Amino acid sequence: MEQSVDSLKVNHNDSEESKTDSQHLTYMDSSEPSFGQDGSPRVLPVTTPEEDGSLTSQNIPGPLTQAQILSAEQFHLVDQNGQPVQYELQSLGDSNAQMMIVASPSENGQVLRVIPSPQTGMTQVIIPQGPLVDENSPQDVSEEKPSDRNLPAVRVDALADSNSSYVLHPQASLTLPKKTVTRILEEPLLAPLQPLSSNTPIWACRLRSCEKIGDSYRGYCVSETELESVLTFHKQQTQSVWGTRQSPSPAKPATRLMWKSQYVPYDGIPFVNAGSRAVVMECQYGPRRKGFQLKKIGELENRSCQLYKATCPARIYIKKVQKFPDYRVPTDPKIDRKIIRMEQEKAFNLLKKNLVDAGGVLRWYVQLPTQQAHQYHELETPCLPLSSSSFPISSLEEEEAAIRDENCTLPSRLHPQVAHKIQELVSQGIEQVYAVRKQLRKFVERELFKPDEVPERHNLSFFPTVNDIRNHIHEVQKSLRNGDNICNSEIIPATLQWTTDSGNILRETVTVTLAEGNSQGESVSSKLETNQTRNSLSPEPAQLLSSLSSFQPKIFTHLQGLQLQPRFTSDGSPALISVNNHPSSSPSRLLDSVRSVVMNNNSLLLGQTHCLQTDTPLTPNSSISSTMSNLPGPDQNLVAVDQLVEVEDVEDTETLEGNVHRILLGNVQTIPIQIIDNPPVLSNFGSILKEPIFDCFGGPIKI
């Protein structure tokens, strides 16, 4: 070891020849006569350009002309992560000592200081800990290849190791750790892939190579500090709270080379994943968090079907990768794809051989949602609009804008007809998410659009995601649970009045329902549903009928295919049937009687509902508008007829009292029925069958 008193001096090069505004750590030998005077100190080649914030290696030939007295503002020091280091410059009282740099701890807890050595013949430098590599060896020298960005390296001529510090001798220099060197390279701020609009959020402008994807912005950061800064600024600007849904597991390092992935766009630079999984952060109103909470837990228990809660779909995705810019391939679309494919294979083969020593830079790709991506933050505000029956297909954008403005505070990206189809399916009992999605796809591709006009599958307005379908199912279930009518009044036609023209009653389809009373003398409310006679079902009644069948399936499961067979007397006149109530009738028998009289294969026509009171008896000359004859007794029969077309009066007979009506069942012959007002000769068991009625199998039907 040379016996000379050495010291380190910090000097700043302001000459015009240096175009990188670099700072140099200069070395002076105190044994020389020029020590302490304006001489020509030897320079340790350490430069820190301030443009891109990276440490570069430059061998500076020739001595400096003059040492300058500097202030702290003239220096820019960075640690091994490329982050600025706070420091101070202090002059020591000893004349032999020049400067002392005191640096604060860096981000990873390491300390960088330059101090005078208490020993003679050496200068002690404490640097970030890490293995030092002698780049004079043939293997390391071959690694140094010219590129646009010079690697930060300083040649080593002699190196002696002390316990906790590294000792530099004259004509010696320091080599930075090689693995650390490859990770402190910072890239200049590249232009975005596509021009951003003027209303781009400020936090999105801080991302490198930023691009807009739907309601999110995607870009990358080159350091964890930059990433944290962007995330913090995004949270402040959007006023959102996030929780981590998924974190990378501490698995072994990934070695699979890739050109692009779900989180990393293609830019011609190969990379490997630095983590096993991406970091996924969800909104505080997302799944497994708040969302739409039911006020009463008991309501959940009373429901047999599975309920879904509406949750916010906003997500933040962070993916850490290691890029290899030295193996970049051209991305010009004019170049033949075969040439690009050959270049990619060549780059992969080289990387597989030198993957450990290939270097590279770290990037954190981030996808941040905008405020429009958040939904379902207000617990009491319904966000899914109830669609109307008529939807003009001409202008979809204006239609969706009107829905947003009028019906909800937070927009639903589903098209109104798609949302209405979900309501229809749920009302029919189809509540499985994937079953609903299958029906929606058939509806859009076969009914809503022509085969050559079907939109793309990524159009979420017509092909919603599973999460959107769950949210809409939840809204429909909530409406059904609260007793809201999910069928719009516009679907059901206006009130149809039964009027007579020249004494003739209009031919209409009639369905009469008599509910069972609770006690004697209590008025029983009934429903009378009418519609114009037609050969086939219209879509609206068919929809309502299917909804009723899903709610009360037991009513429609008995005696299918039965048909009334009218019997005639020997003289050809229609037989008379006397009908009375059964005092001992039960709800189950009433339900069975409903199905027993639904005969024909023609579908039941349903229309506008009218409530009928049983207070006023039906007379032969009265119009059937809002009343119906009162059947005696405490219990009423539940009667349903497929096609009741005509009600007329017949002449009174000597043995039967009251009014006799004929009921025409579609194209079949009329069957006269007489309703007797509690004659004294009848027993409590009610009805008197003057002529039996048989079903299509020849069996008698009990009334």
From Swiss-Prot:
Region of interest (Disordered), residue spans: 1-61, 130-150, 517-539
Residue ranges with Basic and acidic residues bias: 9-22
Keywords, ordered alphabetically: Activator, DNA-binding, Nucleus, Transcription, Transcription regulation
Record bears the keyword DNA-binding: yes
Principal cellular location given in the protein's record: nucleus
Subcellular location: Nucleus
GO molecular function: DNA binding; DNA-binding transcription activator activity, RNA polymerase II-specific; DNA-binding transcription factor activity, RNA polymerase II-specific; RNA polymerase II cis-regulatory region sequence-specific DNA binding
InterPro entries linked to this entry: CaRF
TM regions (residue ranges): none
GO term, biological process aspect, one: cellular response to calcium ion
Pfam name, any one: ALS2CR8
Compositional bias ranges of the Polar residues kind: 23-34
Domain of life: Eukaryota
GO CC, any one term: nucleus
Record comment regarding domains: The N-terminus is necessary for DNA-binding. The C-terminus is necessary for transcriptional activation.
Function summary: Acts as a transcriptional activator that mediates the calcium- and neuron-selective induction of BDNF exon III transcription. Binds to the consensus calcium-response element CaRE1 5'-CTATTTCGAG-3' sequence.
Name of the protein: Calcium-responsive transcription factor
Organism, scientific name: Bos taurus
